[in-house]
């Protein structure tokens, strides 16, 4: 174990860096075919995120029995408590992968047809009966993302909804005030509305709440004891990292956004979890523990997002610079950025968290944890030395995706 205290000038800015690599048993090898994780590279990413305005950042890599834990900065700016990889946090759109798992299990059970119209199960919900379940799950429905309006102004938008409680129908109604962005199936267009519809499908087909289905189908079977869906309660249970929202105005004070209902997102973004639980979840998913092989294959039918990313059914694929592809989801919710991804076989998984949002520099920096975790030292060194490494590759977040973050 290596640990060091890193001073940042004030008590509130005191930062802790801690690194722990723990083999489950002697001789456990790194995930087959992958370079060893670059711990120094991961440390550098976290340190950079703090220099760009994140109060704290952390990452956990589960590597075929060996665990790497790194953290730097604070979980609570008021007390100066150091952030740790055991802290719980809001995972934002990583929730979409949980919703997709439930729906694909329902396909396995013969209760849902991916190519059926959404209106088959929710009569009259959508104005175009050509929109299928598959198109909703792959963001090809054309349904407008209501969060573009809700959070066009970041902090005022958040404050206007942080204590509100919406129904699923309320959120769909907000979306349907706008025309669709494309014909069904014609294009990829990320929209939180799609996974609100997913939540409605889950509740209609099971007769139970989304919370109950998550718990019974995923949280309990995988022993995810740090994972919760507490909507509409505003508090994060147990020890957690506070979230800090960056205002749109340059130099504005960070806003503590920890407590909120997240009712504006629900099945699109309201899960709470930890680095360990998200690693466990995506390892289980990619190793075939949560659905049949046939449905896991359906989940990985990719729609092109850009030259290095694809979107399946509630699952992202990111193609790294070393030629390795990883699978999982990103998450943005006010005050939290999450990257949670696993290898194709699920033997290596990584979850990285910075407790801020609306900060494009931090968003891009935290993406580099994937390179360090999956590509190893040589790739990390090349990225650090390359002039292109500072280029912004993420200009959009998972909330208000129509708003460019410059």
Could you tell me what each predicted segment is?
Residues 50, 107-108, 214:
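Alpha-helix C-terminal capping/helix-coil junction sites
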Residues 2-4, 27-70, 258-406:
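Catalytic loop of the DD-peptidase/beta-lactamase superfamily, centered on the K-T-G motif
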Residues 38, 42, 91, 95, ...:
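Hydrophobic (often cysteine-bearing) scaffold residues that line and stabilize catalytic clefts
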Residues 64, 75-77, 141-142, 234:
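Solvent-exposed coil/turn segments that connect beta secondary-structure elements
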Residues 1-32:
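Secretory targeting and sorting signals
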């Amino acid at each position: 174990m290596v640990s060091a205290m890193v001073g940042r000038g004030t008590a509130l800015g005191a930062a802790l860096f801690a690194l722990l690599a723990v083999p489950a048993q002697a001789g456990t090898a790194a995930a087959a075919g992958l370079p060893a994780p670059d711990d120094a590279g991961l440390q550098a990413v976290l340190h950079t995120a703090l220099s760009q305005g994140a109060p704290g950042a952390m990452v956990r890599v589960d590597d075929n029995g060996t665990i790497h834990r790194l953290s730097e900065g604070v979980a609570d700016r008021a007390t100066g408590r150091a952030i740790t990889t055991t802290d719980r946090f809001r995972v934002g759109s990583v929730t979409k992968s949980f919703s997709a798992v439930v729906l694909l299990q329902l396909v396995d059970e013969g209760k849902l047809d991916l190519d059926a119209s959404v209106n088959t199960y929710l009569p009259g919900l959508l104005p175009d009966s050509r929109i299928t379940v598959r198109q909703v799950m792959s963001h090809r429905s054309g349904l407008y993302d209501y969060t573009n309006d809700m959070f066009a102004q970041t902090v005022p938008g958040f404050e206007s909804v942080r204590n509100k409680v919406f129904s699923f129908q309320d959120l769909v109604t907000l979306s349907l005030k706008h025309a669709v962005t494309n014909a069904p199936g014609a294009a990829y267009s990320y929209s939180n509305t799609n996974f609100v519809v997913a939540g409605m499908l889950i509740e209609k087909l099971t007769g139970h709440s989304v919370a109950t289905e998550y718990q019974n189908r995923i949280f309990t079977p995988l022993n995810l004891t740090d994972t919760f869906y507490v909507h509409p309660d505003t508090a994060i249970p147990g020890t957690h990292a506070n979230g800090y929202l960056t205002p749109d105005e340059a130099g504005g004070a960070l806003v503590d956004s920890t407590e909120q209902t997240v009712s504006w997102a629900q099945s699109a973004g309201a899960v709470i979890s930890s680095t360990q639980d998200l690693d466990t979840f995506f390892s289980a998913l990619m190793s075939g523990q949560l659905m049949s092989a046939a449905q896991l294959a359906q989940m990985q039918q990719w729609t092109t997002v850009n030259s290095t990313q694809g979107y399946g059914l509630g699952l992202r694929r990111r193609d790294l610079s070393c030629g390795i592809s990883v699978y999982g989801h990103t998450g943005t919710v006010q005050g939290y950025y999450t990257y949670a991804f696993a290898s194709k076989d699920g033997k290596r998984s990584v979850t990285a968290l910075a407790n801020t949002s609306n900060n494009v520099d931090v968003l891009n920096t935290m993406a580099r944890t994937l390179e360090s975790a999956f590509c190893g030292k040589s790739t990390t060194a090349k990225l650090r030395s390359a002039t292109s490494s500072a280029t912004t590759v993420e200009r959009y977040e998972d909330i208000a995706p129509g708003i460019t973050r410059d």
